[in-house]
């Protein structure tokens, strides 16, 4: 499959100017008191050189999203790559967990930042679950964070300080971090969201009935695009992840049977060209050229947008490691604040 190379952020500046068919935060109607976005302010370059970013061919179900590429024998230095794997490939040997699909799953419990933390061992890899200290199940929702390439659930949980970021969001939710593909050769671990939810309940952890928000970084799009038709998913947040699968996300936000009830936030650095192009399709899209320092800096139109596109000033990995993006965006969801 032919390699798709993401264009660096500096070249993509022109891609941030949305065409007339896409609403921007400063477009009429007249701005409300929170509207302070100035389109005359140039978008700053990403923090340092672009981190590696996934390339992707089209999805298995939507091959037209990308022309069929041929993968390189090794990653190009300084670039992330994510593409769709259409054929089975050999994998490194990994320890196997015996699992009949029904019995109780083993978990380890500890306390992290004052909240209960569980690491569940499944046949599809580790699943981390964290409850904030003041969690109230009666009004709680669920946040599922899917990591990108070159890490796993354990690595992302530890190195990206996810518990710290989840706590900083002040949202009343159970936070779930499952294993996901760590490279092009890995299969999607949880192609069906219902199986992931079942694994959590098999560890004797009760899921709340509130809103479900899915966050995916980079190559996580391969997993998230397979969950768009799940009846419980209310909102998806793509963090520099729109490399492919546009048809799936179109179904989620526009053409699917439950699209009227959904919201999508797209944050882009390495994927700015693809993400801006996707947003231009929709008259209801609202664009913003920087991540705000807090949710309060978002205008009412931005907060209420069915599709919010943000051109990030943070580069690919800083989007998920800086602590400036995930907590802020979780406050622009249907979750209840603590």
Where are these regions (language model features)?
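Conserved acidic catalytic loop of the alpha/beta-hydrolase fold
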Residues: 195-209
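Alpha/beta-hydrolase fold nucleophile elbow
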Residues: 206-218
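Active-site machinery of serine-nucleophile hydrolases
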Residues: 139-199
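Active-site nucleophile loop of the alpha/beta-hydrolase fold
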Residues: 180, 237-245, 268-272
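Hydrolases whose catalytic domains are alpha/beta-hydrolase-1, hotdog thioesterase
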Residues: 222-227
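C-terminal catalytic histidine-bearing segment of alpha/beta-hydrolase fold enzymes
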Residues: 270-338
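A domain-start/cap signature at the N-terminus of enzymes
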Residues: 29-141, 173, 294
């Amino acid at each position: 499959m032919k390699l798709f190379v993401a264009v660096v952020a500096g070249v993509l500046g022109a891609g941030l100017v949305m065409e007339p068919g896409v609403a921007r935060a400063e477009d009429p109607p007249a701005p409300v008191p929170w509207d302070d976005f100035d389109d005359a302010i140039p978008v700053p370059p990403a923090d340092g050189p672009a981190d590696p970013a996934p390339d992707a061919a089209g999805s298995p179900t939507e091959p037209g999203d990308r022309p069929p590429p041929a993968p390189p024998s090794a990653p190009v230095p300084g670039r992330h790559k994510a593409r769709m794997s259409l054929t089975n490939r050999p994998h490194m040997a990994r320890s196997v967990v015996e699992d009949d699909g029904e019995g109780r799953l083993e978990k380890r419990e500890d306390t992290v930042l004052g909240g209960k933390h569980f690491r569940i061992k499944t046949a599809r890899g580790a699943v981390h679950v964290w409850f904030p200290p003041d969690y109230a199940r009666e009004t709680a929702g669920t946040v599922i964070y899917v990591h990108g390439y070159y890490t796993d659930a354990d690595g992302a949980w530890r190195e990206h300080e996810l518990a710290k970021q989840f706590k900083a969001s002040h949202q009343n939710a159970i936070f779930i971090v499952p294993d996901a593909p760590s490279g092009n050769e890995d299969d999607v671990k949880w192609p069906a969201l219902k199986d992931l939810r079942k694994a959590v309940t098999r560890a004797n952890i009760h899921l709340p009935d509130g809103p479900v928000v899915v966050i995916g970084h980079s190559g996580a799009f391969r997993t998230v695009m397979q969950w768009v038709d799940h009846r419980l998913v209310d909102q998806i947040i793509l963090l520099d992840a729109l490399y492919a699968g546009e048809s799936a996300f179109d179904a989620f936000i526009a053409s699917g049977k439950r699209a009227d009830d959904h919201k999508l936030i797209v944050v882009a650095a390495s994927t700015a060209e693809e993400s801006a192009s996707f947003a231009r399709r929709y008259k209801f899209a609202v664009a913003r050229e920087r991540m705000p320092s807090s949710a309060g800096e978002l205008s009412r139109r931005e907060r209420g947008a069915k599709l919010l596109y943000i051109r990030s000033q943070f580069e690919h990995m800083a989007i998920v490691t800086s602590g400036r993006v995930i907590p802020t965006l979780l406050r622009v969801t249907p979750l209840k604040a603590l």
